[in-house]
Amino acid sequence: MSRDDDVRGRLARHILTDGFHIILDLHLSGGSWIVDVETGERYLDLYSFFASSPLGINPPDVTGDPEFMALLAEAAANKPTNPDIYTSHYADFVDVFARVLGDPALPHMFFVEGGALAVENALKCAFDWKSRHNEMRGASARLGTKVIHLTNAFHGRSGYTLSLTNTDPVKTDRFPVFGWPRIDVPAITFPLSEHLDDVVSAEQRALGQAEAAFREHPDDIACFIAEPIQAEGGDNHMRPEFLQAMQRLCRDNDALFVLDEVQTGVGLTGTAWAYQQLGLEPDVVAFAKKVQLGGIMAGRRVDDVPDNVFAVSSRINSTWGGGLADMVRSRRLLEVVERDGLFDQVKSTGAWFLTELQEVGSRFPGLVSNVRGRGLMCAFDLPGTAERDSLQSILREQEKILLLPCGPRSIRFRPALTISTEELSTGLKGLDRALSRLGNTGATPSH
């Protein structure tokens, strides 16, 4: 592309162009480095296309394999309707997905385009299940219409999910939503040992709110849904004990326990799914992002109802069922994740990175607090929104590091699973300098 191609100007005539001021060079960008076509500058990518790129950009096992690129082109030449007409490419993807990411207790799968529609279909699964479960018990089949969810949750921007998302009024204001029961998230402030009493009290309040919702809406709660770690809402961690207690409440009250792993899934926390580290046994799991397409896995109590959505034709469906080209790409990415043992690598790299991030934070006590992480899903807080936004700008414009905000005052890290400690060290040095520029009295950067 020539430098006078005016990509942003041409786009701005028709769409809102308020993203990064970078024109992505699809040829020179690679791994954890993004190159701007217009300036030639390289940026350290610690956002990975909103946590959707498991191996970074242009992974060699994809772009460096002519045979695979020909296969990908073959799959992309047409866009068949996967739910209706089948291909070996589709079957190959499902086999690899089940092997690398599957849970034997969740054998049912459904694929769709995007995370919001993944959650949407998880909710439809729960509504259908609760209605039929009520009917089996002699209760009203018209009930089973409500979802318990958390404050600061982000589950998407589609029809049902708008009633759950509550991170930023810009995303939900003026759109009609359901008044479903919303309970306070008992988010951990780290270090946990210094805040345990407050966190336990918050958990007790939240559980009391959930119990009240079940009492006030008998037979009408279809499910509880949560992100194992709230992402956009502030990288909010919850203790396993709280989520396990919510799981017990769901079982005691005949509601499904649903997890939204759209951002936490596919290794970011050090296991295929975050719930595997938290002692949880979900009935439905929604996924997207790093999978390259959206979908749900389901099982456990879903099968207590024989005619659930996975048994009755067309109860849930979509035209393309996820997209064949995305499935072919996903299969190769998952094969590399498996071959290279990236889940274990993320565990070790993430533990090292969190320790280093805590060390940086300790040098800026007036600016940095609540350093937290699981695997490579790490974050920290600034005193307020203004400081957070200023730091993000300094990192991008002066240090050439791409990071994301979350919540009202947090910075979150979303690197590729393949990022090296050397690249993370580059990011930490840049962060140290940026914090020093932002102005912490008495703090001296170590690098």
Description of each model-found segment:
Residues 1-447:
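Conserved N-terminal phosphate-binding loop of PLP-dependent enzymes in the Aspartate aminotransferase
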